[in-house]
């Protein structure tokens, strides 16, 4: 999914001639720590200001009088995964979206991004998760996918964690449409794969839910 497919166009950005008092009121109403500032003539993104900056400024001045930060933004053709990364890194509830000309076209909201990720990763689908450890030098999913499908399982989603630098391994979590994945786990072990989780759906579901909860926790700022 691309950023433009989850766009929110209902929330207005700040403009240079907006009063600081009004900008503060809007940020507090939206419960955000910053908002982008857009040129009211060209529609291009000028920068962004934080609530903390505004609270230390004279309330009768305008936003254009403020020293603006470099805006955090995403292009409309970028993937929703990049939006999630930026929101986590900068602790943002609203992420400005621009087109290739850097014209502001809307926002990505935290809730919409989470809904998109949940849909893409099939977190709402019934099934189980199996986590396999792979060494960096041996990293390939082709054989794993073949072995899983040979046991009649359907892969609903795959996530790969950044490898441990010292151990040099990836943790690959694979969501399957089966409740009982004992046969899949046994097959992978027979082919000398290290299976980190191989219990029932109820236990394995905790792994996915924990990862989702961690994402929600960091995005729910």
Show where each model-derived region lies.
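Short, structured interface segments
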Residues: 49, 101-120
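Histidine- and aromatic-rich ligand-binding microenvironments
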Residues: 50-54, 112-113, 186, 193, ...
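A conserved regulatory-domain signal marking ACT and ACT-like small-molecule sensing domains
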Residues: 126-221
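Intrinsically disordered, low-complexity terminal regulatory regions
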Residues: 13-28, 34, 206-210, 214, ...
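Bateman/CBS regulatory modules and CBS-like beta-alpha motifs in cytosolic regions of diverse proteins
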Residues: 1-26, 37-40, 45-48, 55-86, ...
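Short acidic/polar active-site loop segments enriched in Thr and Asp
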Residues: 33, 93, 154
């Amino acid at each position: 999914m691309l950023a433009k497919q989850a766009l929110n166009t209902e929330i207005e950005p700040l403009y240079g001639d907006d009063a600081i008092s009004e900008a503060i009121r809007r940020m507090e109403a939206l419960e955000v720590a910053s908002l982008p500032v857009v040129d009211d003539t060209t529609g291009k993104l000028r920068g962004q200001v934080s609530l903390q900056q505004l609270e230390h400024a004279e309330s009768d001045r305008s936003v254009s009088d403020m020293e603006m930060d470099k805006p955090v933004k995403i292009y409309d053709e970028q993937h929703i995964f990049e939006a999630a990364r930026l929101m986590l890194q900068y602790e943002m509830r609203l992420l400005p979206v621009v087109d290739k000309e850097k014209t502001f076209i809307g926002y990505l909201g935290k809730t919409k991004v989470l809904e998109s990720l949940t849909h893409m990763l099939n977190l709402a689908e019934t099934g189980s998760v199996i986590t396999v450890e792979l060494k960096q030098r041996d990293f390939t999913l082709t054989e794993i996918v073949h072995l899983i499908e040979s046991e009649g399982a359907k892969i609903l989603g795959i996530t790969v964690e950044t490898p441990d630098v010292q151990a040099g391994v990836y943790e690959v979590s694979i969501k399957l449409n089966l409740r009982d994945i004992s046969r899949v786990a046994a097959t992978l072990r027979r082919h000398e794969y290290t299976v980190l989780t191989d219990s029932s759906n109820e236990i394995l579901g905790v792994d996915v839910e924990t990862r989702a909860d961690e994402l929600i926790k960091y995005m729910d700022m």
